[in-house]
């Protein structure tokens, strides 16, 4: 049976649309619906590669997990990844379409709208219920003509809309009323309810205000979602929640690169007992860390130059000499090498830049982007898995330091001879299997900290989605929402 699509739109960015959409996905999955997520256009440096080798935003991966289905490219047909110099890489249905100047977006608009509709039609054929998510504010009147992800999608899908507003940042009533007022009459008719998100306090004291806002906008408030401390992956690095340690366990420092991407690579480490994760904003922040991670980058050469100019290069080399564990992922792996060559100008005008020299690799960028899921093996024969998203190829200059290889011999990771500096192209390496847990337990053993056996990461995430679903059921009128999808 086919049901009417439901759409979550926001009064602003970071109001919690992605998480509420994930909660809806989990709710409908547990109710027995064949449900899938869809977001026409995502702007994010945080991406994932599907089994088919297609690149999509991670928010829809989280939502697909909540639905217990495999992520597919049609769940996020347009992904825009900002680069340096006001450039944006445009990914359409999982593949790189072009890199454009941000101001040329209008020229692509018609084509992108066609592709978004095509993807929606495809996903609608495969599933009975689609939970749609918008992007940013749905009432940006200067963007109405070029809108793809918000009311344009609601119209294409003929979806009813639930408006999500964030009370934690203040001004929630003005943002709700202002958003509704700025919509056209046709758009307002689609809005069938409001969810007030991130509420702190007792609901009974808030009820009178809810009734007042209903009187003003003539739309029901379906409930208030409380501010919660669940471990649900955030969409972008601006809102990342890192888990700080108590000074008695493992301290992991993430070097905060200006063009950092795929920050979710280290999320799973933060759930491990006695592990704290924090950003290193300056070189001194590395001094007390037990492990340093250099994450992925959307502009590796620029970030490498930043490390040199900010003093991070010297600090990282010193920490390496002192035996500290340093781990580079993707762009971080390339940065740890001897040299990066960009003869084709893939990233910009700089054609060559010396790396930190901590790993024996030379990286050459090329026009083709590698996007695929991988299964590989380390030196001890342990399986590691994840996905690749990168331009270029890194060639070992000392084969005795090869650390991770695929069965076909393709090198995906290196270490130094002292075996305290490691790098790999594999995103998600800490998520799958027990690689991350083994690494942390090795550190714990060295520091005389009790080792721990953690719950499987997939099971852990499912438990978090279940708790999120419980919060939704307890606080939001989901019977009303179910009536909407059956109307």
Curated annotation (Swiss-Prot):
This is Cobyric acid synthase. GO terms for molecular function: ABC-type vitamin B12 transporter activity; catalytic activity. Pathway: Cofactor biosynthesis; adenosylcobalamin biosynthesis. It comes from the Bacteria. The lineage of its organism: Bacteria, Bacillati, Bacillota, Clostridia, Eubacteriales. The active site is at 330 (nucleophile), 427. Residues 249-435 form the GATase cobBQ-type domain. CDD domains: CobQ_N, GATase1_CobQ. InterPro entries: Class_I_gatase-like, CobQ/CobB/MinD/ParA_Nub-bd_dom, CobQ_GATase1, CobQ_N, CobQ_synth, GATase_3, P-loop_NTPase. HAMAP family: CobQ (MF_00028). GO terms for biological process: cobalamin biosynthetic process. The gene is cobQ. Catalyzes amidations at positions B, D, E, and G on adenosylcobyrinic A,C-diamide. NH(2) groups are provided by glutamine, and one molecule of ATP is hydrogenolyzed for each amidation.
């Amino acid at each position: 049976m086919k049901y009417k699509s439901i759409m979550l739109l926001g009064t602003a960015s970071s109001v919690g649309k992605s998480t509420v959409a994930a909660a809806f996905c989990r709710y409908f999955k547990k109710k027995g619906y064949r449900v899938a997520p869809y977001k026409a256009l995502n702007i994010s440096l945080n991406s994932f590669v599907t089994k088919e080798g297609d690149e999509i935003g991670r928010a829809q991966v989280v939502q697909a997990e909540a639905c217990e289905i495999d992520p597919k490219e049609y769940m996020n047909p347009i992904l825009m990844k900002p680069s340096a110099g006001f450039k944006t890489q445009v990914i359409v249905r999982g593949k790189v379409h072009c890199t454009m100047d941000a101001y040329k977006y209008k020229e692509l608009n018609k084509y992108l709208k066609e592709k978004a509709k095509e993807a929606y039609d495809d996903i609608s054929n495969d599933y009975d219920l689609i939970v749609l998510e918008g992007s940013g504010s749905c009432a940006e009147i200067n963007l109405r003509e070029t809108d793809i992800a918000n009311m344009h999608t609601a119209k294409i899908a003929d979806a009813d809309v639930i408006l999500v507003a964030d009370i934690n940042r203040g001004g929630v009533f003005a943002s709700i009323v202002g958003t509704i007022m700025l919509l056209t009459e046709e758009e307002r008719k689609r809005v069938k309810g409001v969810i007030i998100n991130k509420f702190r306090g007792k609901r009974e004291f808030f009820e009178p205000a809810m009734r007042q806002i209903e009187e003003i906008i003539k739309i029901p408030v379906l409930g208030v979602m409380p501010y919660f401390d669940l471990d649900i992956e955030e969409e972008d690095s601006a809102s990342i929640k890192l888990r700080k340690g108590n000074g008695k366990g493992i301290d992991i420092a993430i070097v905060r690169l200006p063009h950092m991407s795929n920050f979710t690579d280290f999320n799973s480490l933060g759930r491990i007992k006695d592990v704290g994760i924090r950003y290193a904003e300056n070189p001194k922040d590395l001094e007390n860390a037990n492990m340093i991670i250099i994450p992925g980058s959307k502009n590796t050469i620029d970030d490498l130059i930043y490390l040199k100019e900010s003093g991070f290069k010297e600090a990282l080399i010193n920490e390496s000499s002192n035996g500290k564990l340093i781990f580079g992922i993707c762009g971080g792996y390339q940065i740890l090498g001897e040299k990066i060559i960009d003869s084709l100008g893939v990233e910009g005008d700089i054609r060559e830049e010396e790396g930190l020299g901590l790993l024996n690799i030379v990286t050459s960028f090329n026009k083709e982007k590698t996007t695929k899921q991988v299964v590989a093996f380390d030196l001890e024969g342990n399986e590691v898995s994840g996905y690749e998203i990168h331009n270029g190829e890194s060639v070992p200059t000392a084969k005795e330091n090869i650390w991770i290889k695929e069965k076909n011999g393709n090198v995906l990771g290196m270490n130094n001879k002292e075996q305290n500096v490691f790098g790999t192209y594999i995103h998600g390496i800490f998520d799958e299997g027990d690689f991350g847990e083994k690494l942390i337990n090795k550190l714990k053993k060295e520091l005389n900290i009790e080792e721990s056996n953690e719950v499987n990461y997939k099971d852990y995430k499912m438990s978090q989605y279940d708790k999120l679903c419980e919060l939704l059921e307890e606080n939001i009128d989901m019977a009303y929402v179910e009536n909407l999808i059956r109307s």
